[in-house]
Design a protein with these regions (language model features):
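Metal-dependent phosphoesterase core characteristic of DEDDh/y 3'-5' exonuclease domains
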Residues: 22-29, 33-64, 86-151
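Metal-dependent phosphoesterase signature
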Residues: 61-81
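Single-residue recognition of alpha-helix boundary sites
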Residues: 17-19, 76, 139
Length: 151
């Protein structure tokens, strides 16, 4: 079983947290569960209420379509991770994302906020699909997701 994960983030407010400590916060977790032939089986989507910037930055809204209203009544990150963990199940799976930046963000944000998630321990089987895809195509440089979609 494979799960592709994508995180969307908003910048933090410098008045509330030092940028060097936490530049961004997760505002959405999306995932798709796929079978061995990579056919979609199920989808997961949950909005996450940011703690360190109550306003979705304009550039983030334009990029993601995520509005202030979408996150204002959303759950906080611990509850979102619990929901993702339940959705993932306990059968074990390979986790894929377009780069390692989502895993880095998840670990950094959980560390900063003191969140202990069993799901993070299970994400040792994390795959950087951007790198896998680059190797499959024999490319020297990594591709943006947008460029990869046109291949």
């Amino acid at each position: 079983m494979s799960i592709f994960i994508d995180l969307e983030m908003n910048t933090t407010d410098v008045r509330l947290v030092h940028k060097k400590d936490l530049r961004n916060e997760i505002i959405e977790i999306g995932a798709v569960r796929m079978d061995e032939a990579f056919h979609p089986l199920d989808r997961f989507r949950i909005f996450v209420r940011p703690q360190y910037n109550g306003v979705i930055e304009r550039k983030i809204y334009k990029l993601t379509g995520i509005s202030n209203g979408a996150v204002s009544d959303a759950v906080y990150l611990p509850e979102a991770l619990d929901a993702l963990e339940v959705w993932c199940g306990s059968d074990g799976c390979e986790i894929y994302a377009w780069s390692n930046s989502d895993l880095t963000q998840l670990r950094k944000e959980c560390g900063f906020k003191g969140i202990d998630s069993a799901l993070l321990d299970e994400m040792v089987q994390w795959h950087d699909f951007q790198e896998d895809f680059r190797q499959m195509l024999g490319e020297k440089n990594i591709l943006s997701l947008s460029n990869a979609m046109h291949r």
